[in-house]
């Protein structure tokens, strides 16, 4: 075995996926691994770099297509990817990198605001050595929340936003609203 593998962190909005991604990458940095994080270019909510919802920042390379940056990340042992659901080539990239000895850590939503799967992330699950599903706190009743609910009426899947546009909700509150 070449040591390469895929770790997948999934869950709804506000469940701490980006925070967990940063935590894992930092641990590898402490262990002297050469690490890089990648964020989706169109995610400009808080500025440059990778941001958590509680405003912690971590430097990150930006792209909209992962396969375009293969040469730029070849020298790194650990590759962290935030907002993985937005990359159309996430499956091919992760599989290629893991097969070539890289540790790939992906943080992604597992479902849309309509509770439909992000197909690329669903396809990444059977290729991953480790899958963790995080939960958030329901912003209505304060119980465990597994779903993201959009506050507006837009129907497009890719609308990037924070608490101004989305809430984490439990099943009961998702259905009753």
UniProtKB/Swiss-Prot annotation:
GO terms for molecular function: ATP binding; metal ion binding; thymidine kinase activity. The active site is at 83 (proton acceptor). It is an enzyme of class 2 (transferase). Its EC number is 2.7.1.21. Keywords: ATP-binding, Disulfide bond, DNA synthesis, Kinase, Metal-binding, Nucleotide-binding, Transferase, Zinc. InterPro entries: P-loop_NTPase, Thymidine_kinase, Thymidine_kinase_CS. Homotetramer. Two molecules of substrate bind to each enzyme tetramer. It catalyses: thymidine + ATP = dTMP + ADP + H(+). Belongs to the thymidine kinase family. Zn(2+) binds at residues 138, 141, 170, 173. This is Thymidine kinase. GO terms for biological process: DNA biosynthetic process; thymidine metabolic process. Phosphorylates thymidine and thymidine analogs, such as azidothymidine (AZT). Part of the salvage pathway for pyrimidine deoxyribonucleotide synthesis. PANTHER family: THYMIDINE KINASE, THYMIDINE KINASE, CYTOSOLIC. Substrate binds at residues 113, 157-161. ATP binds at residues 11-18.
């Amino acid at each position: 075995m070449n040591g390469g593998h895929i770790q997948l962190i999934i869950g709804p909005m506000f469940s701490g996926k980006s925070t967990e991604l940063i935590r894992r990458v930092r641990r590898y940095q402490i262990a002297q691994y050469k690490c890089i994080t990648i964020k989706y270019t169109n995610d400009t909510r808080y500025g440059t770099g990778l941001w958590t919802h509680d405003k912690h920042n971590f430097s990150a390379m930006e792209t909209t297509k992962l396969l375009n940056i293969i040469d730029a990340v070849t020298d790194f042992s650990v590759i962290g990817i935030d907002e993985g659901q937005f990359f159309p080539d996430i499956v091919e990239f992760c599989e290629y990198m893991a097969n070539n000895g890289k540790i790939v850590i992906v943080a992604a939503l597992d479902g849309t605001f309509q509770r439909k799967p992000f197909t690329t992330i669903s396809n990444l699950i059977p290729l991953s050595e480790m899958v963790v599903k995080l939960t958030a706190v329901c912003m209505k009743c304060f119980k465990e929340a597994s779903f993201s609910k959009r506050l507006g009426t837009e129907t497009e899947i890719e609308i990037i936003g924070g608490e101004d546009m989305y809430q984490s909700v439990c099943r009961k509150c998702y259905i009753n609203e």
